Amino acid sequence: MSKQPDKQRKSQRRAPLHERHKQVRATLSADLREEYGQRNVRVNAGDTVEVLRGDFAGEEGEVINVDLDKAVIHVEDVTLEKTDGEEVPRPLDTSNVRVTDLDLEDEKREARLESEDDSA
């Protein structure tokens, strides 16, 4: 691993998809932090998040899409209006959101969260 910032950024941009999962993590709300014993979690579609920064700060909504290529998420009701009137989802960086509710339909995800709770 290089110390040079340019090479650091380059490796982040060119990371394969299985490594980009690490780039779409967001902090957990205080009650979820206490429940699961960890500070942040990978954001999945179906999770509920609160926007902390930007024009949409204070908005809360469900994650409708996670784009690993661009390392951004799309949240329902956080949209921009194009000049032709069409509403498009506003991409958000996961560092600007807080997870307030987890989608635990995936049993493996739930088991992983519980096991990390035991080790913490």
From Swiss-Prot:
Protein biosynthesis in keyword set: no
Listed Basic residues bias regions: 10-24
Gene Ontology CC annotations of this record: large ribosomal subunit
Keywords: Ribonucleoprotein, Ribosomal protein, RNA-binding, rRNA-binding
SMART domains the UniProt entry points to: KOW (SM00739)
Keyword Ribosomal protein among record annotations: yes
Family: Belongs to the universal ribosomal protein uL24 family.
Role, per record: One of two assembly initiator proteins, it binds directly to the 5'-end of the 23S rRNA, where it nucleates assembly of the 50S subunit.
Name of the protein in its database record: Large ribosomal subunit protein uL24
Organism, scientific name: Haloarcula marismortui (strain ATCC 43049 / DSM 3752 / JCM 8966 / VKM B-1809) (Halobacterium marismortui)
